[in-house]
């Protein structure tokens, strides 16, 4: 045969295949290691963000609790301070040794007006239903039921005023209610 005949490409040697596979495996390993490092960094960043957010939420909760505690403390303080003039009026009345019944009555009326005004400024309002008002179990407490000319289940008389604070009942009004005919 002659040397000029076309040669067929020969299959790569096993060493070359092995070297190519090793190079490819090394490239793939390097790529995966890089991806792993990137994912670990992202995971660490997210874990850090989570811990910071958790700490911030805890701090916000503590601040809110502190604010509520302060609001209660200073709300009560403000209410108590508004009652001091009423206490002063009672002290002044008791200091008078020679008061007439008329003077005592006038002083008690003035002190009651002062107390009522103070309560109203602090959103404490009286529940004092007029006779004939429909009985409301949310604001009234029936002490007795009596026969009356009025429609059934209406207030006949108020035995003791009730009180609400900002629409929440502190004490229901004690009332007598008309019986059904």
From Swiss-Prot:
Gene that this sequence comes from: grpE
Regions that span the bilayer: none
Location in or out of the cell: Cytoplasm
Gene Ontology terms: cellular component: cytosol
Name of the protein this chain belongs to: Protein GrpE
InterPro entries documented for this protein: GrpE (IPR000740), GrpE_coiled_coil (IPR013805), GrpE_head (IPR009012)
Keyword Hydrolase in annotation: no
Family to which the UniProt record says this protein belongs: Belongs to the GrpE family.
Subunit structure: Homodimer.
GO molecular function: adenyl-nucleotide exchange factor activity; protein homodimerization activity; protein-folding chaperone binding; unfolded protein binding
CDD domains the UniProt entry points to: GrpE
Role noted for this protein: Participates actively in the response to hyperosmotic and heat shock by preventing the aggregation of stress-denatured proteins, in association with DnaK and GrpE. It is the nucleotide exchange factor for DnaK and may function as a thermosensor. Unfolded proteins bind initially to DnaJ; upon interaction with the DnaJ-bound protein, DnaK hydrolyzes its bound ATP, resulting in the formation of a stable complex. GrpE releases ADP from DnaK; ATP binding to DnaK triggers the release of the substrate protein, thus completing the reaction cycle.
One of the protein's GO biological processes: protein folding
Keywords for this protein: Chaperone, Cytoplasm, Stress response
Main location per the UniProt record: cytoplasm
Source organism superkingdom: Bacteria
NCBIfam families: PRK14139.1 (NF010737), PRK14140.1 (NF010738)
Pfam assignment, any one: GrpE
